């Protein structure tokens, strides 16, 4: 076993159970471990939603228990400039972005890594993400693999990492299943053992999304229409809706043509007219896509894919893998054709590609290729 005692690891301590157990495991493995707590959002007056102070207290308690030093850093300015402004601009453009992916790219594995490197003299950083690393024996570049716990795997959120970042990052809980992580935390008497997982977007926390968004983007109400142009109801703003969405349309009791009582789903956003197009039934052809065009590509190996390739793709988190074919357009854009039509492919979200357990990388969905019935 290699001697880890000369290697310094800076663990991103969030105040949650995963980072707590990560710090414990690395200490057990003999590393010199220190924690770093990031504050990425300046609190507003919504104190009941903002858990930063509570998270910091929990992170400090865990570090005290483990006997490691906790550093603190404020990345709120970087977060605003590199994550939040993009998030708003995408919503303004009628798309549905994923800020957690951008946060990993710009903050956790860029600003954090640079600070750990330059100020704290780290050999590695570590996070409580459920992914694994693989170092091929032939000396090839390191790969990122799905986490062992398929239900918690977070490789979808980390596809923007390069092989250099993968080589510098440790993911101790990626080798474990979640119940085991909680069991370790409990055994070690860590205050975070029973703390529930955070579910909200990092800067919104658990507060109501529509309320939060309306503070920054003025809502423009408009019509909800059927594909034939019949007005079905009103929406409060296109930005509050995403393709394939069923809840929140408030037209549930409305029957369609021929007394159709199936539920309504968002099929399209007509930005020019500020109209939401809704259709009935989850199998409606307008909800289906044959594929997608993706841009802003990131490949873990850094080499663009230049040949047609069979693999699988996820177009949203916790989705079953979709068998597909990648057809390169150029180094910046690819066409992806699904083996079978897929529903709720959403521009602005990420398409992430896999071969087996290996995460190849991904890109932003620019547009979907609409389903055409044979």
UniProtKB/Swiss-Prot annotation:
Protein EC: 2.8.1.13
Gene Ontology molecular function: ATP binding; tRNA binding; tRNA-uridine 2-sulfurtransferase activity
Active site: 103, 202
Compartments (UniProt record): Cytoplasm
Catalytic EC class: transferase
Residues the entry annotates as binding ATP: 12-19, 38, 128
HAMAP family: tRNA_thiouridyl_MnmA (MF_00144)
Protein name: tRNA-specific 2-thiouridylase MnmA
Species of provenance: Vibrio vulnificus (strain YJ016)
């Amino acid at each position: 076993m290699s001697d880890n005692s000369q290697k310094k690891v800076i663990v991103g301590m969030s105040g949650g159970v995963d980072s707590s157990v990560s710090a414990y495991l690395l200490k057990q493995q003999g590393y010199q471990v220190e924690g770093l707590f990031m504050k990425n959002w300046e609190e507003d007056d919504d104190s009941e939603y903002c858990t930063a102070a509570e998270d910091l207290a929990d992170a400090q308690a865990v570090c005290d228990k483990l006997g490691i030093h906790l550093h603190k850093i404020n990345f709120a300015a970087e977060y605003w400039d590199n994550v939040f402004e993009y998030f708003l601009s995408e919503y303004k453009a009628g798309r549905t972005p994923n800020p957690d992916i951008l946060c990993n790219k710009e903050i956790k594995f860029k600003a954090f890594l640079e600070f750990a490197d330059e100020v704290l003299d780290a050999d590695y950083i570590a996070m409580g993400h459920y992914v694994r690393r693989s170092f091929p024996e032939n000396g090839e570049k390191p790969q990122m693999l799905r986490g062992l716990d398929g239900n918690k795997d977070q490789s979808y959120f980390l596809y923007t990492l390069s092989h250099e970042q993968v080589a510098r990052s440790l993911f101790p809980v990626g080798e474990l299943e979640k119940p085991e992580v909680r069991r370790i935390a409990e055994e070690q008497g860590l205050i975070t053992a029973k703390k529930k997982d955070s579910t909200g977007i990092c800067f919104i926390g658990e507060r109501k999304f529509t309320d939060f968004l309306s503070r920054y983007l003025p809502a423009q109400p408009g019509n909800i229409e059927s594909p034939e142009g019949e007005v079905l109801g009103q929406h409060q703003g296109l930005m509050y809706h995403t393709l394939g969405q069923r809840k929140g349309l408030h037209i549930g009791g409305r029957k369609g043509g021929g007394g159709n009582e199936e539920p309504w789903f968002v099929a399209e956003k007509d930005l020019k007219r500020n109209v939401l197009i809704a259709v009935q039934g989850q199998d409606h052809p307008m909800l289906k896509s044959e594929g997608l065009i993706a841009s802003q590509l990131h490949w873990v190996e850094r080499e663009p894919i230049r040949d047609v390739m069979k693999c699988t793709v996820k177009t949203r988190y916790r989705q079953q893998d979709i068998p597909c074919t990648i057809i390169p357009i150029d180094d910046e854009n690819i066409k992806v054709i699904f083996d079978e039509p897929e529903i709720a492919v959403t521009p602005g979200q990420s398409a992430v590609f896999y071969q087996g357990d290996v995460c190849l990388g991904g890109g932003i969905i620019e547009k979907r290729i609409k389903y055409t019935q044979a």
